[in-house]
């Protein structure tokens, strides 16, 4: 054969050989005529002829019935062996999900359509047909049900003892095919599916099953099992607790959380909350973004507790209402974690952090917030991936590498499954956030979220934020999160639900006292024993109020720390035994007093802390009883209005007059603005403990006594122009001027081409106590720790009107502040000014102690 001669197709060669044999058989059949029979039929007729010689009177039909019974018996035995799992004769059989077809023999090259053997066909012809890829006519297929077995049967009129029939039956047994149930089709391997699709020529149920299987497998993510060598350990804990937070006692921490909208924590070793941003060790750029652009002057309650917990490396579940600052709570720790990670390599696409969102709109909103923090840092790239957006562009961005991906679950699964899972490698994901996790589960994303979590490394840090905490979320958290910390912020749960809160606002003390008499008169009309407790802020006010109520005909009992123990015990006993009794007391009884009959608590002097308000109102509605807590509020008590707005429920506010609610909101908003600017501060706990706090208590007590005594003398209460402790609780007016620090920020060029900034802060002319407070070692060291600036005392102190006489003399006392950025210097001076304000307050307290009060 010549080299260029093409090779003969084996299939065509086999077909030509079959046609040649068929022509020879046709010629033999024509020669023998109609009496020509196949070898099998000849054997059958020969047996019949031999049997009819000795038994010519027997009916041929009886013999055929006998052979049919023998065939059925043998067939039954073969079926039983098959169902028992005897696969000795079926090693070469292949189970393929076909519909009523016989598989090929051991040496077959292709899978032909199975057909019933025809009576009268010779064995040679049947072998040729078995090897053929062509058919003379289409076979009639049996209807089938998924899971049933259809096989090629041997006709009952053939001799079971014939050798050729036995051989052919063996082939039939090998080629029997059992149909697969729909659920079994999904489990077939890819090579079997390929063989099935190649050999089938009809569109039956099997092909439909395979089409559904491919659709199902398209979105399925296989769980990734990581080995210990693949996962490099990473640091989770980046938080160092500030010294001023570490010094707080457990009781003070509990009161601090109570003042932060009743923050409740559950879990092992939860870090303490922070009070200001500088306690997190943030750089000046982020500090400016938080305080100036985002207007978070101080951390919100969820931020104050959640950020230290997340930065400590703990898995966190944060429950807080929308708009409470949850986004910043996870962005800051996420950025800190990414900065600590090894940068993405040339063949790595990322991400390092993943944020899952239930909706496109929320994902875009989170992406915008992340962009605000990363716009000045080219090393951190973020990408928003949501359904409905252009997938091609997202793929191109991922190929270039991204550190943060904000995505909806469905689109992230699409990205994970692209390119056989090679587009995104989840091995580098170390930080996962699920924002609005309750909505993720409400919208049915639980299966997708579970798939994603099984692909990410098991030692990841996971954070969930939600407005509610349904059972589905609890179950998910128990499976995915490791030893989580639960943080719940809900100021509306401060007060017992059985207590109805009320408030009345007054512009003068006399109207407030008249309202007190009105409410007490109503209690005396009750037929049932319903007692009343009136809380005041000092012992002097308690005694004055007791005398005035006695003069108005009320039987009252008074208890405060100034009375001896026996008198206090006697008054308490009489109060419990007197029907509709009235008790006037100070905060000494705000905790632990349990009198079930108390139905009304009147807070005559408004509470100044959340803890004080919670415990005073808690003296009513003991057990399953119901009660009322009434606050008589002066229009200057802004801190109390803020506490009431945080504590009162919406349905309670709706029961009040519109003018009262409007005034209360205005007072609360004014105090809230003062909190952000630093003009006001909210006292934590019950006002502090120890000798350091005695000055504040002393000042507050005498200020209130002065106002009350002026009222008793019939004089108008004069305004006391003294700053209230901690920024003005009680009387909010502050007429003390806070000196502004004199400084200028300058830039210095270094020989190596770098630049530094410095400022001279003049402190020589500050009052002595203020100057000491601003320049002492603890003040400067804390500012250095929070800002990273260098602060040095320079020069010496000169009395007022004096100064250096010549160039050799030291300059007037000042602080030299140095840093690499001007933002750090501005932050350090802001902190220094806060210390100056503390010094001014201490100076004023000394003046108050040195003066005598005159009426």
Swiss-Prot record:
The keyword Nucleus applies. Residues 307-487 form the Helicase ATP-binding domain. One of its GO terms (biological process) is mRNA branch site recognition. It holds the Pfam family Helicase_C. SMART domains: DEXDc, HELICc. Residues 1-164 are annotated as: Disordered. It is found in: Nucleus. Residues 57-87, 119-129 have a biased composition (Basic and acidic residues). It comes from the Eukaryota. Residues 498-668 form the Helicase C-terminal domain. One of its GO terms (cellular component) is nucleus. InterPro entries: DEAD/DEAH_box_helicase_dom, Helicase_ATP-bd, Helicase_C-like, P-loop_NTPase, PRP5/DDX46/KHDC4_KH, RNA-helicase_DEAD-box_CS, RNA_helicase_DEAD_Q_motif. A motif (Nuclear localization signal) lies at residues 113-119. Belongs to the DEAD box helicase family. DDX46/PRP5 subfamily. The Q motif is unique to and characteristic of the DEAD box family of RNA helicases and controls ATP binding and hydrolysis. This is Pre-mRNA-processing ATP-dependent RNA helicase PRP5.
